[in-house]
């Protein structure tokens, strides 16, 4: 794999004399294992992100500022200008699952029976990634909780955890079985080293459902899904939830998450690192809302980056804006954050 110490190393003359720099991949592994990283992992730099495969090619995604599209699950998505991501349209006409007690009549999982030939161009994309330098990383979204509310609408979904728990369990089981089939195809054809799996579990200040309810409805499914990936060649499971989810960290560890990306400052990250760092790494700490805004300045971004790095330290922490991809809503913010992280990194890793 890519963690052989002197394979594909680069010279670094910055500190006087010659020494070997870790590859981006090695540096991430050193960070999450509590080893000896020689710099910060800079946001998404270690991830060779792959989005395409035959399923995603057949399921349109909302594009920034473009008209709504209907995806393979029948959910109508739109991404309005000035907003951080796509979201379903949930008027009566567009809600897919109008009655959870009859969910089987409404929810039809997309096909996954694509031929080897249909996978070929996507295998070729994966083969372009230098696995010594990067993790071949499969992007997967939405997650189970998000899919539940994409299909039903958020209030309906939350009410149904209470009013129709049996039907909600059935729907989650159905979604889980489909995800496991999807995982099988991804591992067979793409052979990823990492997965980047989205599922937002809270608002800025609270989880959407209680920890007990989360444990009951979602922990078993995610143990199966992330367990499957780990058993089939995936080294690093990265889960995106740009929300409050501190109360769910023990379940994240149990389900096999290595890195929680999107960890907002409302989670008291320093406390989480002290308590759980040896078992999970926290990637975030720079709230998108605080820097990715119309009136942003390089000074503002650097100030926030510096605060995060000084507050959270160098072990089990990856500085990153909480946005769920290496992009920003306002052009230049992501790149400016990367430059600031590089600058602060040189000061903190002497």
Regions picked out by a protein language model, each given a short descriptive name:
Residues 49, 84-86, 144-145:
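Short, acidic Gly/Pro/Ser/Thr-rich loop/turn segments
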Residues 67-118, 129-137:
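A contiguous, low-structure linker/loop signature
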Residues 33-35, 40-80:
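N-terminal accessory/capping or targeting/presequence segment of soluble
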Residues 54-57, 81-85, 89-92, 149-150, ...:
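Short aromatic-enriched loop/helix-cap "lid" or pocket-rim segments at secondary-structure transitions
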Residues 4, 8, 13-16, 20-45, ...:
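Active-site loop segments of alpha/beta catalytic cores
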């Amino acid at each position: 794999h890519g963690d052989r110490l002197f394979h594909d190393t680069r010279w670094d003359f910055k500190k006087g004399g010659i020494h070997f720099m870790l590859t981006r991949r090695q540096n991430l592994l050193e960070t999450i294992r509590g080893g000896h990283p020689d710099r910060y992992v800079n946001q998404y730099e270690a991830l060779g992100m792959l989005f395409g495969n035959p399923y995603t090619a057949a399921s349109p995604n909302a594009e920034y500022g473009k008209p709504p599209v209907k995806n393979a699950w029948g959910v109508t998505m739109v991404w309005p200008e000035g907003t951080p991501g796509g979201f379903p349209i949930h008027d009566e006409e567009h809600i897919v699952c109008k009655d959870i007690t009859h969910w089987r009549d409404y929810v039809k999982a997309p096909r996954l029976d694509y031929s080897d030939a249909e996978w070929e161009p996507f295998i070729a994309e994966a083969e372009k990634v230098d696995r010594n330098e990067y993790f071949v990383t499969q992007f997967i979204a939405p997650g189970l909780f998000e899919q539940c509310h994409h299909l039903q609408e958020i209030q309906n979904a939350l009410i149904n955890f209470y009013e129709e728990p049996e039907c909600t369990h059935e729907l989650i089981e159905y979604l889980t079985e489909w995800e496991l089939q999807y995982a099988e195809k991804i591992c067979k054809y793409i052979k990823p080293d990492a997965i980047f799996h989205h599922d937002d579990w809270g608002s800025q200040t609270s989880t959407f459902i209680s920890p007990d309810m989360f444990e009951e409805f979602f922990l078993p499914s995610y143990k199966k899904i992330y367990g499957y990936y780990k058993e089939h060649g995936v080294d690093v499971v990265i889960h995106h939830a740009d929300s409050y989810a501190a109360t769910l960290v023990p379940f994240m560890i149990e389900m096999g998450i290595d890195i929680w990306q999107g960890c907002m400052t409302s989670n008291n990250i320093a406390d989480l690192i002290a308590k759980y760092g040896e078992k999970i790494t926290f990637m975030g700490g720079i709230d998108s809302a605080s820097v990715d805004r119309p009136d942003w300045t390089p000074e503002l971004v650097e100030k926030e980056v510096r605060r995060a790095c000084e507050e959270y330290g160098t072990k089990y922490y990856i500085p990153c804006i909480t946005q769920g991809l290496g992009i920003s809503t306002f052009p230049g913010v992501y790149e400016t954050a990367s430059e600031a992280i590089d600058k602060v990194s040189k000061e903190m890793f002497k």
